[in-house]
């Protein structure tokens, strides 16, 4: 943790003789704290109501788009953190997209207690490192004036941040998907704790390397957002274990995503790079190309190079507890079905060959082998409006499936639930009357994220990993990247998990790894 004039420091009136006579760095060395740990100095030593710097995790926040800022707000309100640096290759609030035009700005104003705050830029939707710095600075000035906060530093390059901010304890990573793995690896190698938004990586091999780095450095506490879910997987497993639907055979999970464009052609125009955007840093490890707003902000998710598609976006919310409860590891077969787009080359139509963006709609089947606790099972993922066939139990009652949901199919019955396994109910089976439907806790995605923050802090204090670490997400990370590889190839894939290779379509193996741009490889980042 830093102790310089640029950071909030205790005033002399808050320190007694004992704490003044013992510099914090000397205190840390005396108790043998590691680079990945921090020391707690009881608040009563410093006075009533004082938040000791040693009580807080010094955090650098990397990625200040709309979702990044949305999740920054609950984090700065958690007194266990002190944000000391922000980073984004985009400086100004220009060209950002969001679910609506005003709600994020209003949330910012309420959080920082300044109802006149404006984002600058094009003055529509907040984003960029200038806004991030402004939010952090004004929050501490207006809400915690007792800290005498002097301001956080702002960087456009995360590598420079790591070089200069030697005393940060942790980072939170909210960049586009293609940078998640690289920045996580950079942090772990520097013994910085990591909170990273899903997916861990949009490449299978890269994700495996980051997970191995986390295994090799257990003192670094890691957390993948989202951890847990809104659902009731424990209830579902109790029903399955009791034989309520017989032997589980299939799981079906469907979403209304994407809610962003999935372009069927590459941009051909060449607009100017917006002032304040470092396009080279935004591209990062990927192949350089001309700037286009169709690549950036919300719509990056639809491109194989920059995003992970609908499953990477939403499957972590719905499937985390499913993977854990059913002990799903690596699938041996992946079967894609996907939409295509046609165009006219007058006077003839043709089908667009596309291996650069996710399809408008798809459903993908993952075949998982049996383990000691269950037989083999198939997992089906659907997006773009695709859904499984309406079960006879609903069809006979003139009902249909909701636009999002989850269905567990056994050889003697079915369990229907919401997308995140919430509000499950048995719709047919051998024990229709005995199970009791359980109410689910409903939390927004931002609420899910914020509920994990105290657990992350406790894990750092206790130097012990907790549920939600990136190692636990290994097989879900693998699945979302096999989803992308199967859609990109358009072919049934046979996967050899031990060797991390596709055995029947050799060309598809290139989609499992990244061809890193010079200076951006994961080995040297």
Where are these regions (language model features)?
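N-terminal glycine-/serine-/threonine-rich beta1-alpha1-beta2 phosphate-ribose binding loop
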Residues: 2-190, 208-221
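Non-transmembrane alpha-helical segments in soluble domains
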Residues: 28, 133, 159-162, 184-188, ...
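C-terminal helix-rich "cap/oligomerization" subdomain common to oxidoreductases
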Residues: 29-53, 357, 372, 458-525
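Structural recognition of the beta-strand scaffold that forms the well-ordered cores
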Residues: 58-62, 83-88, 172-173, 195-196, ...
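Glycine-rich, aromatic-lined ligand/substrate-binding cores of catalytic
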Residues: 64, 270, 275-464, 479-484, ...
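Short, solvent-exposed loop/turn and secondary-structure capping segments
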Residues: 70-75, 95-100, 182-186, 206-207, ...
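Short, solvent-exposed turn/loop segments enriched in Gly/Ser/Thr/Pro and often Arg
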Residues: 93, 154-155, 174-180, 200-202, ...
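A contiguous active-site-proximal alpha/beta segment in oxidoreductase catalytic domains
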Residues: 193, 200-276
